[in-house]
Swiss-Prot record:
Listed InterPro entries: TPR-like_helical_dom_sf, TPR_rpt, TTC5_OB, TTC5_OB_sf
Effect of residue 285 to E: Loss of interaction with 28S rRNA of ribosome-coding tubulin. No change in interaction with N-terminal MREI motif of beta-tubulin nascent chain. Loss of tubulin autoregulation and accurate mitosis
Gene encoding the protein: TTC5
Location within or outside the cell: Nucleus; Cytoplasm; Cytoplasmic vesicle; Mitochondrion matrix
TPR repeat boundaries on the chain: 7-61, 68-98, 103-130, 136-174, 179-216, 224-253
Role, per record: Cofactor involved in the regulation of various cellular mechanisms such as actin regulation, autophagy, chromatin regulation and DNA repair. In non-stress conditions, interacts with cofactor JMY in the cytoplasm which prevents JMY's actin nucleation activity and ability to activate the Arp2/3 complex. Acts as a negative regulator of nutrient stress-induced autophagy by preventing JMY's interaction with MAP1LC3B, thereby preventing autophagosome formation. Involves in tubulin autoregulation by promoting its degradation in response to excess soluble tubulin.
Pfam families: TTC5_OB
Keywords annotated in UniProt: Cytoplasm, Cytoplasmic vesicle, Disease variant, DNA damage, DNA repair, Intellectual disability, Mitochondrion, Nucleus, Phosphoprotein, Repeat, TPR repeat
Site location (Mediates interaction with N-terminal MREI motif of beta-tubulin nascent chain): 147, 225, 259
Name by which UniProt lists this protein: Tetratricopeptide repeat protein 5
Amino acid sequence: MMADEEEEVKPILQKLQELVDQLYSFRDCYFETHSVEDAGRKQQDVQKEMEKTLQQMEEVVGSVQGKAQVLMLTGKALNVTPDYSPKAEELLSKAVKLEPELVEAWNQLGEVYWKKGDVAAAHTCFSGALTHCRNKVSLQNLSMVLRQLRTDTEDEHSHHVMDSVRQAKLAVQMDVHDGRSWYILGNSYLSLYFSTGQNPKISQQALSAYAQAEKVDRKASSNPDLHLNRATLHKYEESYGEALEGFSRAAALDPAWPEPRQREQQLLEFLDRLTSLLESKGKVKTKKLQSMLGSLRPAHLGPCSDGHYQSASGQKVTLELKPLSTLQPGVNSGAVILGKVVFSLTTEEKVPFTFGLVDSDGPCYAVMVYNIVQSWGVLIGDSVAIPEPNLRLHRIQHKGKDYSFSSVRVETPLLLVVNGKPQGSSSQAVATVASRPQCE
């Protein structure tokens, strides 16, 4: 390009860049100028703003319309909505052909492919952009795409998830004040948590990353996906109050997205049913319950009764049989509980498998079992022993509803002894996390 021509083009590109930046600022900072009640209009308002911006850009472009930078900015403007735009794909494809080093065009084209559902093509764009220039946007996008790539084996998927965490960490390192990088790091930890057997340390890392996203970027608090993903983690961690709050907030921020409202409703229905069954001890008649409890035998403790139980620390310990009512919150080391199943309850997600346990002391506690295969379960009348039980006390208030109950969390069915028998490895499975396939 000649020097004079370059001088002529520069102010035009600058003006186009300003218009596109304003458009994205309108979308990303929508709730700074609108109330949450306007959330249902957001997509419509962004669409109108996009049309207005494209018209203004057309007036500015003039003779430079075929230049790669102009094609990229026009494609980026068209790409502001959550929907796939064939026109954006066409313009951005031309831009990268004309100027292969134009990293922002590769990033935008990758997002277009992502919206189109072509995850492999999106992956190629983001990886390609990084070969030209290491940048946080490509790293962020690569992190989220890696978690969605089709894989043939569980190992391959785990490898992609680990790689996703690495890319997100690199993005954070490039700019610790970028809320999107922290949010995507939180999502990659969320996937890692579900693909590697629910390590509490990883869930803490996910929650910390989400908190950091909100701390460094005020826009993060208006991101419905952040609230839904964090609520999913809270639900799995049995922090039900925080989970309900998160689902409710996500629903308010994106009323057209049905999932948060459904998840909130499902959790409320689960808590309604659970507390009702706990209060009525599964509606088992008093006489029948006495007969069930009268049939409990020391033999039902199985391997928990012979001093050969191996604790989490790997040491052989002798367990002491304790009534449910004497348990303390947290892990009760050196103790074992034994009771009868009076009801069972499954949710839409099938995890956890929840049942009510009663012992001769009287109270009914919920037992939540994680990492189960779908076919696993216990029946009413089964005797269940739980070594070193982990007790949770729940006090939940949400939208005028109050719930209060005690539960025992069991990370795997392998820890349970049912009717005197330990559970085989075929009873254990790994949980997975589902997310909507869109740019984060």
